[in-house]
Amino acid sequence: MANALNADKAISASTATLEQPEHGLPESHLAETDVLVWWGHKDHGAVADEVVERVARRVWEGMGLIVLHSGHFSKIFKRLMGTPCTLKWREAGERERLWVTSPSHPIAEGIGEFFEIEYEEMYGEQFAVPEPLETVFISWFQGGEVFRSGLTYRRGAGNVFYFRPGHETYPTYHDATVQKVLRNAVKWAHNLQGAKPSILSAPNVPVEKALEPIVERGGKLHAPGEAGFR
């Protein structure tokens, strides 16, 4: 996948794995990451909660996140969605046809009306996620099910894209069209304005710094300058 992304000279992709210290995602590495692509499967529970929170903070600050296939059950995706992220599924190597439902979206640039993947795992509705900002792709499967397979979100200052294809026993990520979607998605998710760490702060503004003169009235729980409860 990194090789497919690096085929675009505007992208410089490296890899991080579960087995590495801090899963290859220490603070220093995330601070230099514009977009994180996340694929996970049976070891979702092995991902350290502190790393999940670290990634969530970076997304809120403006780092892009692309979640692939079975990553719908990853801790980070469920953390950002706030829903169970459940769905129907079937492993049968059936054909998947992905229809472009938002042809003017940057992620769909150069894709055409639809594209097909000959062998894939079926995902079917209901997909228990929040209503997305945009639905870029809808999948039809040979067995008759349909699925919202390309969804965009914004969490804090970060752009998030969920892309359905990518079962581990099929060569999906070697498909040229899938690779193009991933490169498009990385470019879309990249926040050109840079990180916004101020989104994580909740400043206690004193009366004397109000924009208009005011007189303090009533009781309060907090002392001047106190950070407050979270």
Role assignments for model-derived ranges:
Residues M1, H29, V51, F77, ...:
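Stable alpha-helical elements in mature extracytoplasmic
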Residues M1-S74:
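Helical hinge/lid and interdomain linker segments adjacent to catalytic or ligand-binding clefts
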Residues A7, E145-F147, R154-K209:
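Extracellular ligand-binding/catalytic regions of CAZymes and related secreted enzymes
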Residues Q20-H23, H41-G45, G71-K75, E113-F114, ...:
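Solvent-exposed loop/turn segments at secondary-structure junctions
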Residues V37, I66, E134-V136, F161-F163, ...:
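Hydrophobic/aromatic beta-strand patches that form the interior of the parallel beta-sheet core
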